[in-house]
């Protein structure tokens, strides 16, 4: 800025505008900065001259947001210059005090409360903090009287303590004030300051600021206590009594968010205040009463972590003092296990060495890390392991450096280094074990992630330097991480079904200088040939595995034999051409035997990584390959075009493809095979073509002329225009974006301009083509959007012309054509394209500028006469709303006091033209609604928009925004509409017009004058009250809640009779009861007399309506809505029955509940049943004789299935000898029902009930018990299968739990037959795929075992021991184990199982295991734990298996990586044969010799 301008402005106050702007404030701020010091010493200087202006500006509520921030920045500089002047001249200090009014000081000190945030601006709190701190400095300097100073600052502190501390500037203000006033003032003004502050830690984003505030107050209090007495022990005890009880209560509470805030920020600082605090805190933590040992240990674990992170505790004593930490590795909560690992493995001082006990503990418990199922916990684990390796490296380096010292204990230090190496070796072997085939996803992923992290630390000399992370020091030793066996396992995993596992394996292998264990050329060519075989696979993950294998081979082969990549590419190209020729003859045969996708994927990999150096060595050959591939892309398109462009591509079978012998041998339908072949081929073709066009322009520019590039761009657009299969054209979309981006960024003008005319061509296609009429316009919107996304530099220009053109097309009148009764609807395509543009997140910053005309277009489309346009208008409106409002969270989702929605003022300031448009449309719609009760369909989107807005809260001295004053009466009219849906959405819309603080007054006003209103008006008022309460009640302050319960209950009491009269509809009554139940019936405050009166009146009404038949009208017309009204009445009655039982006359609770179970409406019956199910006293309630009788009457077939299913499941909790006879259903009848064609919920309820009945039958009729038990076991086996749905498996588990293994275990006769099956089934449930089932099974298992709660893995280990000890010697048990071991898919012979595994399955999809938690090899090892020795059955089976292995692989010359023995099915079959053979002590020398000869899987070689 020109200095002369500044000086001129500083001399002329009149030059400042009456309504200052950002520029005027910036100019004035520069004036203050550039001014001389003497200008501030004069009484008529810069201070006095601008005081009035700045004072009025601070109070000006009409300033926009940027101007307010600029004003604060200017005042900050002004205050600093005044402060400096006052320090130099006391006279100026006195003058400032006399001039600045108390109101101005008050405004300055109130800024943190009034200017917490300004919508749309950042940095507001920083500016406010700066002004507040400078204001406090100046006030302390200029105030002449200590009394005045203390009174003002204490009053400021008192107000500040009531401000919203969800703002960091408020926390800072309190800290600054407390440092002046002292901590005693805080506790005087707010005795529960610490308790209130602790609750605010729930929001982690503010936890640090709030913790700093708490710490400031408590530290000052500690200093004041220290001044009172010199006894440090007494000071620490008194000080801890202030905060420790509340901290301990939260430590053992259930609020994880508060605990996280305390642990991260508050407690470490508190423990560091004085040396003795930590010991006292841990002592109080360990002696906290009324908590379990597990909870106490877990809390101590967190405390130890805090102390260790704070460097208060340096080393853990895992042998004595902290031995409990080792047991917590078996805790049920995975977060506790992770905390144990982090506590031992990590240390703030990374060079601190681990002890032998630390290594032993980690090594013995490291298995826990491979069973982490939760993705978030897994990320924490991986980061923790990385930090652990950093510490291990630093500590080993430190040890090695110390060993060079002359006085060091070299023997002890050398032992620590050796132990570190032993740990790493053991760790790698554990990772290796979890890479074997059939290991579950999380085990493989964690293992690979660990290894990927470990190799980046430079331990292995064979790792490329580019793959090693930079560090100041290295490990003092080296070791081989990936050996031949691990390398083989990773290569095998290249065809894993999961993308992330395949990619991670390839990344690890490529990080090595040479492929570990495969260094010869023959190894590379062998791998290459295996990769070629996989390229011809049907399944996509196998194709990709083959492509990755060849990519891996190319990477290493090119290093040793230059030109290998070219030679390999030619081989792949020839195979691709051969398969294309097969497709010309028969698409079906090509889909089965000669797919294209694998070769296309591989070629894409080759050209993505192709370096110019390789091309230069044989330029002409590479050019020929590129041109052949580009032509091949057109050939492929010609082959698959008819399939993908068919009106019904999913069921299209080209002529002649359904004939021939190949069809009879297919496992998939021909149409499915051809379609999959076609769209996958196109997907990979588009990807390859894009890579070729973008990569090779710089290599062969003479071949890729603008004409050629334009031709293939139009070809891609043709794919998007004509293809009907959504999977196909959506796969082209990202490729077309990449291609257009490349063209736009090209430095050649004639190429960079190519996409522009494509955009116009797309717009022409919308109007010209009528063959694309689909509900979402196929790929046309993607074709246009791709160009807009790609044109980064031209994006604003392109979007402007595109959106304007599309809106113009969408507004064109529809012309009907009588050709085959179809419509040519470019309007539909235009609106669908707009929807795609506004949905695309990469265009959000630009597209939002055109939201206003698009919203208007979509609203008008709601009223269109044609359904296709109305339909796409709805979809467009949804996309626009999501773009305007961002998050899809419900409106009432509040984040701890932060209003993060879009206010009405902000919305209409962003989209100003919508104000008049929406008002005009709303007036028309309401007028139509009033005249003929037929709303314009545009009314719904308008009200929907308002329902998503929030009230425009004024900031500071701003006046309330009145921009919606014209909308308010219109929306209120809608709440009284005769159309229910209009009333509902209008009531939600009203919430944006109401200030939360005025909610109580508003509700009272709504409840006045209810008498005489029509039913629709009453219903509308109740809907409005419900919407307002739902939106605002959770945001009320404690004082506002108290006011609410003092005022509103009386208003409800006054109109209670009107709402519940016979004239009021049951819909309105139900809504009335719903409001009472949600906001009044749960409040049991006995001091609120009016509230309790309202609750009693509600309870009496519900009882009268439910139990007094005369209270219900008999006129059929007046009973509309009665069932749902009675359902809500039943909900209230049942939830409060125990509390109000004194008002239930002489009737018992059992009688009242049984009456509801017999009610005429099934809604009431369902509500009653669900209330019993959810009750913690369920068993007591069900065993009430009257309730039991009622439940039994709900079990016959003529009852509604949902009612019947719930009743049956409840009866399982009630059975005793009396109730069993009353039930009237025998166990055989239950079995018949389960085996019948009853609906699944009924069957599952009978299964649960059957477990209880058999338990009772055991004591009454043992013969029948034995027969029924066997049938029950068969049912459990069929319903516990992993392929059964969750509800069926849970029903089977519940049946076992109701049978009660704990009590049944003591019955001797139970062990005389198949009782062991229940133990085996419970073991299966302990390893179920669903965590809820595992937890339920673990709860029952540790009750039977008599142990404390532990992790499921540990419970399972104990359960295995108990099962074997109890049943291991029984013949039937061993027979069952043998059957489980050797039976596979109904086949018993090992040789047949091996043949089945070896046979190639050409189906598109394999049958996937549903249990991804419990792997096959884990299950095998557990079954072998039970199996006896000697065991002739297993011996015969294993012998057959060994002979099968020897014969099937006798002629194999080499199996190797990706070979047959690496196939998961083949591997597991062979592994099972070998493990069972080892169990029965059969010799395996021939098998091991064979596997060594053919290079079989490492687990089979010795």
Curated annotation (Swiss-Prot):
Coiled coil location: none
Alphabetical list of Pfam families matching this protein: DUF2428, TPR_Trm732, TPR_Trm732_C
Phenotype caused by lack of the gene: Loss of methylation of the 2'-O-ribose of cytidine at position 32 of tRNA(Phe). Increases occurrence of 1-methylguanosine residue at position 37 in the tRNA anticodon loop of tRNA(Phe) and decreases occurrence of wybutosine at this position.
Any one Gene Ontology cellular component term annotated for this protein: nucleus
InterPro entries xref list: ARM-type_fold, THADA-like_TPR, THADA-like_TPR_C, THADA/TRM732_DUF2428, tRNA_methyltransferase_THADA
BP-aspect Gene Ontology terms: tRNA methylation; tRNA nucleoside ribose methylation
Record's subcellular location: Cytoplasm; Nucleus
A GO term for molecular function: enzyme regulator activity
Keywords for the protein's UniProt record, in alphabetical order: Cytoplasm, Nucleus, tRNA processing
PANTHER family: DUF2428 DOMAIN-CONTAINING PROTEIN, THADA/DEATH RECEPTOR INTERACTING PROTEIN
Similarity section: Belongs to the THADA family.
Known function: Together with methyltransferase trm7, methylates the 2'-O-ribose of nucleotides at position 32 of the anticodon loop of substrate tRNAs.
Protein name, entry field: tRNA (32-2'-O)-methyltransferase regulator trm732
């Amino acid at each position: 800025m020109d200095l002369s301008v500044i000086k001129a402005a500083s001399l002329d106050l009149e030059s400042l505008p009456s309504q200052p702007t950002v520029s005027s404030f910036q100019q004035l701020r520069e004036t203050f900065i550039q001014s001389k010091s003497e200008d501030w010493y004069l009484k008529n200087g810069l201070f006095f001259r601008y005081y009035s202006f700045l004072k009025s500006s601070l109070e000006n509520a009409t300033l926009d947001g940027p101007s307010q921030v600029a004003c604060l920045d200017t005042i900050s500089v002004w205050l600093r210059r005044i402060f400096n002047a006052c320090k130099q001249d006391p006279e100026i200090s006195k003058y400032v005090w006399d001039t600045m009014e108390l109101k101005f000081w008050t405004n300055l000190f109130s800024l943190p409360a009034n200017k917490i945030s300004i919508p749309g601006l950042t940095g507001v709190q920083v500016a406010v903090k700066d002004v507040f701190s400078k204001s406090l400095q100046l006030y302390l300097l200029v105030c002449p009287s200590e009394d005045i100073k203390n009174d003002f600052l204490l009053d400021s502190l008192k107000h500040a303590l009531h401000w919203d501390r969800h703002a960091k500037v408020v926390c800072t203000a309190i800290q600054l004030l407390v440092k002046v006033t002292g901590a005693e003032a805080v506790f005087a003004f707010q005795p529960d300051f610490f308790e209130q502050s602790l609750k605010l830690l729930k929001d982690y984003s503010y936890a640090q600021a709030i913790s700093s505030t708490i710490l400031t107050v408590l530290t000052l209090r500690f200093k004041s206590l220290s001044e009172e007495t010199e006894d440090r022990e007494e000071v620490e005890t008194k000080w801890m009594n202030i905060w420790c009880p509340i901290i301990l209560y939260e430590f053992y509470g259930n609020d994880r968010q508060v605990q996280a805030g305390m642990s991260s920020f508050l407690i470490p600082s508190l423990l560091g205040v004085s040396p003795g605090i930590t010991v006292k805190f841990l002592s109080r933590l360990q002696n906290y009463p009324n908590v379990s040992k597990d909870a106490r240990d877990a809390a101590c674990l967190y405390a130890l972590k805090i102390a260790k992170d704070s460097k208060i505790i340096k080393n853990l004593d895992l042998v004595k003092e902290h031995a409990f930490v080792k047991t917590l590795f078996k805790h049920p909560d995975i977060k506790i296990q992770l905390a144990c690992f982090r506590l031992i493995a990590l240390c703030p001082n990374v060079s601190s060495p681990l002890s032998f006990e630390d290594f032993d503990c980690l090594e013995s418990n490291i298995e826990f890390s491979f069973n982490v199922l939760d993705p978030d916990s897994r990320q924490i684990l991986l980061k923790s392991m990385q930090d652990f390796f950093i510490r291990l490296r630093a500590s080993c380096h430190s040890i090695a450096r110390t060993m060079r010292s002359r006085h060091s204990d070299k023997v002890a230090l050398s032992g620590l280094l050796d132990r570190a190496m032993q740990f790493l070796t053991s760790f790698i072997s554990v990772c290796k074990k979890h890479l074997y085939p059939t290991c579950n996803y999380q085990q493989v992923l964690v293992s690979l992630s660990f290894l990927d992290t470990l190799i980046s630390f430079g331990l292995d000399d064979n790792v490329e330097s580019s793959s090693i992370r930079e560090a100041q020091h290295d490990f003092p030793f080296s070791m081989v991480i990936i050996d031949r066996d691990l390398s083989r396992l990773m290569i095998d995993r290249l065809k894993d079904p999961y993308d992330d596992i395949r990619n991670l394996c390839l990344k690890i292998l490529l990080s090595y200088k040479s492929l570990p264990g495969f260094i010869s050329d023959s190894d590379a060519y062998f791998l290459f040939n295996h990769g070629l075989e996989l390229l011809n696979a049907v399944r996509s993950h196998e194709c990709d595995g083959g492509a990755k294998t060849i990519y891996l081979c190319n990477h290493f082969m090119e290093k040793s034999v230059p030109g290998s990549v070219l030679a390999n590419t030619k081989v792949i190209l020839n195979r691709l051409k051969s398969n294309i020729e097969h497709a010309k003859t028969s698409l079906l045969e090509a889909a089965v035997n000669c797919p294209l996708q694998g070769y296309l994927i591989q070629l894409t990999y080759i050209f993505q990584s192709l370096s110019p150096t390789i091309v230069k060595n044989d330029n002409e050959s590479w050019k020929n390959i590129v041109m052949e591939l580009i032509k091949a892309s057109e050939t492929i398109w010609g082959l698959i075009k008819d399939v993908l462009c068919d009106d019904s591509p999913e069921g299209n079978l080209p002529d002649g493809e359904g004939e021939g012998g190949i069809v009879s041998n297919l496992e998939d339908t021909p149409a499915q095979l051809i379609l999959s072949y076609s769209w996958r081929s196109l997907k990979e073709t588009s990807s390859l073509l894009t890579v070729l066009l973008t990569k090779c322009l710089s290599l062969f520019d003479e071949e890729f002329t603008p004409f050629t590039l334009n031709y293939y761009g139009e070809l891609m657009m043709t794919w998007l225009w004509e293809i009907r299969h959504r999977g196909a054209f959506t796969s082209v979309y990202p490729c077309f974006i990449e291609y257009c981006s490349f063209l736009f960024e090209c430095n050649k003008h004639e190429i960079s301009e190519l996409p522009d005319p494509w955009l116009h061509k797309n717009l022409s296609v919308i109007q010209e083509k009528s063959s694309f009429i689909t509900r979402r316009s196929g790929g046309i919107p993607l074709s246009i959007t791709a160009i807009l996304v790609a044109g980064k530099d031209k994006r604003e220009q392109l979007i402007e012309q595109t959106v304007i053109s599309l809106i113009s097309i969408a507004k064109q009148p529809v012309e009907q054509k009588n050709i085959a009764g179809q419509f040519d609807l470019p309007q539909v395509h235009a609106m669908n394209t707009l929807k795609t543009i506004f949905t695309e997140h990469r265009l959000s910053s630009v597209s939002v500028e055109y939201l206003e005309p698009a919203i208007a277009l979509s609203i008008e489309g709601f009223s269109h006469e044609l359904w296709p346009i109305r339909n796409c208008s709805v979809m467009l409106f949804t996309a626009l709303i999501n773009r305007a409002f961002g998050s899809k969270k419900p409106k009432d989702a509040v984040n701890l006091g932060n209003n993060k929605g879009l206010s009405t003022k902000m919305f209409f300031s962003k989209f100003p033209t919508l104000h008049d448009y929406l008002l005009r449309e709303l007036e028309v719609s309401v007028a139509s609604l009033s005249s003929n009760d037929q709303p314009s369909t545009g009314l719904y989107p308008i009200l929907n928009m308002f329902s998503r807005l929030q009230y425009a809260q004024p900031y500071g001295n701003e006046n309330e925004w009145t921009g919606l004053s014209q909308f308010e009466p219109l929306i209120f009219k809608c709440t009284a509409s005769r159309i229910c849906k209009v009333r509902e959405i209008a009531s939600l819309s009203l919430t944006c017009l109401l200030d939360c603080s005025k909610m109580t007054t508003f509700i009272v006003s709504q409840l006045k004058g209810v008498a005489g209103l029509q039913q629709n008006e009453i219903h509308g008022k109740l809907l409005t009250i419900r919407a307002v309460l739902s939106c605002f009640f959770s945001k009320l302050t404690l004082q506002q809640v108290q006011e609410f319960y003092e005022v509103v209950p009386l208003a409800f009491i006054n109109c209670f009779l009107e709402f519940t009269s016979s004239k009021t509809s049951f819909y309105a009554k139900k809504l009335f009861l719903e409001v009472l139940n949600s906001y009044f019936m749960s409040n049991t405050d006995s001091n609120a007399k009016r509230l309790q009166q309202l609750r009693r009146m509600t309870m009496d009404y519900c009882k009268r309506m439910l139990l007094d038949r005369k209270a219900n009208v008999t006129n059929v017309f007046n009973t509309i809505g009665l069932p749902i009204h009675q359902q809500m009445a039943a909900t209230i009655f049942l939830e409060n029955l125990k509390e109000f039982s004194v008002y239930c006359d002489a009737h018992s609770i059992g009688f009242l509940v049984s009456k509801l179970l017999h009610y005429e409406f099934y809604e009431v019956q369902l509500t009653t049943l669900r209330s019993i199910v959810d009750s913690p006293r369920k068993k007591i309630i069900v065993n009430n004789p009257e309730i039991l009788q009622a439940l039994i009457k709900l079990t016959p077939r003529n009852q509604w299935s949902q009612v019947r299913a719930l009743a049956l499941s409840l009866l399982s909790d009630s059975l005793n000898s009396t109730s069993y006879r009353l039930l009237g259903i025998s166990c055989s009848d239950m079995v018949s029902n389960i085996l019948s064609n009853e609906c699944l919920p009924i069957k599952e309820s009978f299964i649960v009930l059957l477990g209880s009945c058999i338990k009772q039958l055991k004591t009454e009729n043992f013969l029948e018990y034995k027969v029924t038990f066997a049938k029950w076991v068969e049912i459990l086996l069929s319903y516990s299968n992993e392929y059964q749905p969750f509800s069926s498996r849970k029903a089977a588990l519940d049946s076992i739990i109701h049978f009660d293994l704990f009590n049944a275990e003591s019955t001797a006769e139970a062990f005389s037959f198949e009782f062991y099956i229940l133990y085996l089934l419970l073991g299966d449930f302990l390893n179920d795929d669903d965590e809820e089932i595992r937890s339920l099974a673990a709860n029952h298992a540790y009750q039977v075992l008599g142990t404390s709660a532990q992790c499921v893995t540990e419970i399972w280990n104990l359960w295995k021991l108990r099962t074997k000890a109890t049943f291991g010697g029984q013949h039937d048990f061993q027979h069952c184990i043998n059957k489980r071991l050797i039976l596979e898919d109904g086949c018993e012979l090992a040789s047949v199982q091996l043949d089945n595994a070896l046979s190639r399955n050409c189906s598109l999809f394999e049958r996937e295991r549903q249990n991804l938690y419990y792997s096959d090899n884990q299950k095998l090892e557990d079954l072998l734990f039970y199996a006896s020795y000697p065991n002739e059955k297993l011996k015969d089976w294993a012998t057959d298996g060994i002979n099968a292995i020897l014969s099937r692989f006798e002629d194999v010359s080499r199996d190797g990586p990706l070979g047959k023995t690496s196939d998961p099915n083949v591997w597991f079959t062979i592994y099972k044969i070998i493990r069972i053979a080892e169990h029965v002590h059969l010799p395996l020398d021939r098998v091991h010799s064979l596997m060594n000869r053919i290079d079989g899987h490492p687990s089979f070689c010795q």
